[in-house]
């Protein structure tokens, strides 16, 4: 199981492996592949405005592997597999009852990367949540809360190179849908955007 955000931390400082060479350019690679791994934190803004249930998300964690195809110096297309874990405190508004809802998520973003000055990277694209699982326990019995995130999201991120093999990255994930969840007999709709931040390492 991958170490678990979030968010699609963007394709970043990555080990580079040329796959083609530009003619007449002194052998400098024009197209190359890049790889990276990273870890970070993720915070979810989870809202259920019409429900009888109050939700308090906690800071979670994420881990990811990335791959990108880079064209020249300024443009790349990439993807990643990101595993994240976290928790939400759910409580009933009309009584003193709360439970910790444990969440696990797997996301696969696909994004366009714009690179500036070999230091800053801007990342934009869709993010697909292929697994979103949340559950809590009542008297030793597991209860299913339902998916925390919709299947399709949009994401934008920024990466800043700290060293030759290390980048600091942040990302915002916006949901393109609503979720339906259940807690102690109450069914309600939720919306869930995310903010992630972390470090990406060249290897």
Regions found by a protein language model. Name each.
Residues 1-10:
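Bacterial N-terminal signal peptides
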Residues 67-69, 112-114, 160-162, 201:
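Residue-level signature of outer-membrane beta-barrel architecture
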Residues 32-36, 52-98, 106:
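Glycine- and aromatic-enriched membrane insertion/assembly motifs of diderm outer-membrane
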Residues 14-69, 120, 124, 175, ...:
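Short glycine/proline- and aromatic-enriched beta-strand/turn motifs that initiate or cap beta-hairpins
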Residues 38-46, 82-88, 111-117, 121-136, ...:
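Short glycine-rich beta-strand segments
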Residues 20-22, 45-55, 85-105, 132-149, ...:
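Flexible, solvent-exposed loop segments that connect beta-strands
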Residues 156-166, 189-203:
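Outer-membrane beta-barrel "beta-signal"
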Residues 73-77, 119-122, 160, 164-170:
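Repeated loop/turn-to-beta-strand initiation elements of outer-membrane beta-barrel proteins
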């Amino acid at each position: 199981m991958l170490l678990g955000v979030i968010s699609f931390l963007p394709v970043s400082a990555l080990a580079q492996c040329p796959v083609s060479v530009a003619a007449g350019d002194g052998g400098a690679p024009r197209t190359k592949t890049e790889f990276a791994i990273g870890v970070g934190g993720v915070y979810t803004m989870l809202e259920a405005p019409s429900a009888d249930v109050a939700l308090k998300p906690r800071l979670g964690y994420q881990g990811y592997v990335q791959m990108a195809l880079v064209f020249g110096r300024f443009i790349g297309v990439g993807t990643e597999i990101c595993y994240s874990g976290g928790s939400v405190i759910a409580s009933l508004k009309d009584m003193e009852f709360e439970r910790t809802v444990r969440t696990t998520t797997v996301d696969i973003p696909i994004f366009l990367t714009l690179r500036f000055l070999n230091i800053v990277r801007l990342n934009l694209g869709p993010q697909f949540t292929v697994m979103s699982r949340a559950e809590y326990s009542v008297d030793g019995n597991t209860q299913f809360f339902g998916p925390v995130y919709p299947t399709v999201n949009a994401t934008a991120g920024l990466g800043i190179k700290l060293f030759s093999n290390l980048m600091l990255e942040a990302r915002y994930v916006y949901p393109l849908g609503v979720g339906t969840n259940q807690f102690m007999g109450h069914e309600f709709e939720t919306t869930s955007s995310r903010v992630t931040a972390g470090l990406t390492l060249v290897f």
